Every structure is written in C-alpha cells, then in structure tokens.
C-alpha cells in the first residue's frame, strides 16, 4: 500500500512456477517483484482499473521490467490458469474497469470500498455498485483500490450506500452545508481516509457523492 495515497497494488498467480498478472501500480512495486520472484512466476499483463495517478504512478516501471501489456478495458482473458473478466464500472471515472478473477475475487478500483463507495457521478456509481457488484456472489472477495479488503456479502449487509440504494434503509433528511451550498445528507459512511463519504442532494435537485471533509452539519 502506498502510504500517502493509501492505494493498493496487487499481483496474483495461478500457481508457483505459473502465470501472474498485476492489478494497478500506484504503490511501490518492490513487494510485487519479490512475490513474482518467490513464486517463480511469469507476468502476463497489468490490469489497470483506471488512469488516476495514484493507481498508475509505477506502471512504467513494471512495463519496463517485464514488457507486458496494460489491460484497461472490459473483456475476457485467460492467462495460464487465470480467468479474468473486465467489467465496465464508470462513476468515479469514465474509464473505470473492475476485474473479476475466476469465482474468487473482484478488484473494484475506486468504485466499491469497505463500508463506502467512490466519489463521482451518483447515478453511475449507484448503477456500477448495484447492477454489477451486487450481482456477484456474496462470498466473493472484494479487493479495492485503497486499504482493506471486504466481501460482496458484507457490503450488501453493512455498506450504508448499498443499504439505502437497495431500500433496506431510508434516505437521510439531515440538512448540511457543502462548499457553501445548502443540501440534504442522504447517506453518510466511513471512508478509507478517515474523513467519511457522503451522498448529498442540493436544493436545486442535483446530487453528488463527496468527501466527508466537505460536509458541514448545520448544528456545527
């Protein structure tokens, strides 16, 4: 994990002496290289969830070292024993892609986190979370772009955004200020950076998913 951005970079392999793929490259690549060496694996590709700097900062180093292609679009691939599906999940960014590996794990980039979702276009984020991720099995591991992993089932049960979007909980009604604009706080959740995440509706009817540091309670 990169200590300033708290961004994750991953490497997975089908077996020792087999095939490996990287997922994002925003963190120091030394642990990834060490893992590949320990496994005696042959890298086949870099899977890029999106092109924000905190996810690609060290991508050029991996490409220079291993001369492998970057995969950054939806599709299906098979490398050795690794079966990978790329799913379009726009919202946090237009180019966001999640990668499902077999029936075991999904790399969600900055769309779905432990207890939170990514900031961005609310309608697109909601569709990506509810129509794509919540269609996956409950026991599937969620490996996000930042900090701790979770599972689809846990987020279905406990993620405040998912609970409201699924109808399990009502939208909030608290009045707040967001950057000098009056708004209603529809959802509040913890977030990986410790500042929280909020879905708000402004008085003109527009919505936004914003970092919690931008939200001021009216009573404060």
Over which residues does each language-model region extend?
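Active-site metal-binding motif and surrounding structural segment of the metallo-beta-lactamase
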Residues: 29-73
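Core dinuclear metal-dependent hydrolase active-site scaffold
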Residues: 11, 76-101, 106
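Histidine-centered catalytic micro-motifs
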Residues: 46-56, 87-96, 142-150
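Short active-site oxyanion
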Residues: 18-21, 42-45, 68, 139-140
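Accessory terminal helices/loops
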Residues: 127-141, 147-220
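A short acidic, helix-capping loop that chelates divalent metal ions and anchors anionic groups
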Residues: 57, 115-120
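Conserved beta-strand hairpin/beta-sheet module of binuclear metal-dependent hydrolase folds
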Residues: 1-39, 98-109, 115
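Glycine-rich phosphate-binding loop signature in dinucleotide/nucleotide-binding domains
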Residues: 38-42, 79-82, 136
